[in-house]
Amino acid sequence: IKTNGLYDKIMSSLKAEGIEVVELGGVESNPKLSLVKSGIELVRKEKVEMILAVGGGSVIDSSKAIACGYYADFDPWLFNIHEKNPTKALPIGVILTISAAGSELSNSCVITNEETKVKSGFNNDIVRPLFSIMDPTLTFSVSKFQTGCGIVDIMMHTLERYLVDEGRNELQLSFCEGLLHSVMEAGKVVINNPSDYEGRATLMLASSFSHNGLTGIGSKMYFTVHKIEHEISGMFDYVAHGAG
């Protein structure tokens, strides 16, 4: 974001409104618990009132974990292993730069504990972002590989809600089928033409709709494939989520 001008645009806009900013960089793919803990220390020290996540799923999920951890007097990892439930979180906003995880509209937060090599997530509406700014032009520079990984993640979020045997209903299935068809068509376009606005816009919307609850309405979800992938990228953190 510092090479494409987005960083400067954001900072100048915030400065123009008199908003003080504290930065936290260093987010990696398969976001790490150690950075979450550093972020919690930072937001407490600086008395941060809101978190603006600029990036993709790793940045957003890190922000969600920090937002919950701000109010926790215990190890924030306990949220991810389901020993504690978050009851309060700092407000979160998003400026999205890649179409993939759908974290910009989801209630999901997945973090990797690099010491134990465990990758685990929790779902709670308290971490659903208040807003997401979604400009498809910000994804024009995303590589073919990362675009492909994103497409796989979007499709798996949808398929794991579609291929269930409890609570299926015609409208929900139609949502899934329409989204999958649109993603496959848009994917073929943007792989060959990364700057195709309509294709990128379709993927960006599909990323959000695949994981905001719409495609799973009324059905029971297990997310077995995602759990298998978490084992892979938890052990080998160089594996991109979509590739895993």
List each model region and its residues.
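A glycine/threonine-rich phosphate-anchoring loop and its flanking beta-alpha core
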Residues: G69-L171
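ATP/NTP phosphate-donor binding region
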Residues: I1-M50
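Short Gly/Thr/Asp-enriched flexible loops that form oxyanion-binding sites at enzyme active sites
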Residues: I10, S38-I40, V59-A72, L105-S106
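Alpha-helix C-terminal capping segments
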Residues: K45, S63-Y71, P86, I217, ...
